[in-house]
Amino acid sequence: MNGFMIPLALSILAHVLADFVFQTDNTAKEKSEQQAKGFLKHWIVVFLTLVVLMMPFGLMDVLLYCVVLSLFHILLDVFKSSIESKRGPATRFSMFIIDQLLHLMLIVFLVPISSFTIASSFSAFIVWIDFHTGLNLAVLPVSKMLSVLIVYLYVLFAGAVFIRKLFDLIYKNQPDYLERIVGNSSSLDNVRTGKAIGIFERLLVLTLYLTGNVASITIVIAAKSLARFKNFDNKDFAEYYLIGTLASVMIAIIGGMILEVL
């Protein structure tokens, strides 16, 4: 199984990039509305991301694998969308988690039954780098490096989706909860920037956890709280902020714990 660790990691990396980094809000909206063009655009992104990341193994060797995996990826998305369209926030929250598990299980199933051969051009490139720079890329812990990258991307970007769906679940009886909490459109624009703030927050918390500076995490939380201090008079906002911050920190710490055992 060790020989499959790199293609396995590259496949998971392609999935994370295609689902959470390269997928636009418009494409996600089209998929949620079960529009064919949304699924088609997402399939193209998934397929091209897979092809690019699998290039070290040679295009012809992995082309069938990329086609099969990307098609099954879209079928899972169609299945998820068809269920979510008939249900509420609780189903969408659980289906998000189930969908990610199914995608990972699909990759784990397909990789061992596929053939991966290092392309001669890629091997020549490694030799060229070694000869001209003295860097022996062959001894790099590639699998570990890919694992770190995957967990970081999941924590940063999938974490944002998880938190949004968590809020939708908590405030399921208040469909306009954002407007009610922030009070006006200008504040609503500020709430949208919370996604970017959350990404940086999880980046810092995860890095601090992995470097053993757990106590410094409180400084990150304190700095974020100071920036929003004047909004805490609004009880609804204070609860919203607390839930989001705790969920964000929890996701980052869980990511760090996963990396510790990998």
Features from the language model and the residues they span:
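Alpha-helical multi-pass transmembrane bundles of energy-transducing inner-membrane proteins
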Residues: 91, 95-99
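Hydrophobic alpha-helical transmembrane segments
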Residues: 1-85, 100-184, 196-198, 204-210, ...
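Cytosolic juxtamembrane amphipathic/interface segments immediately preceding
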Residues: 186-193
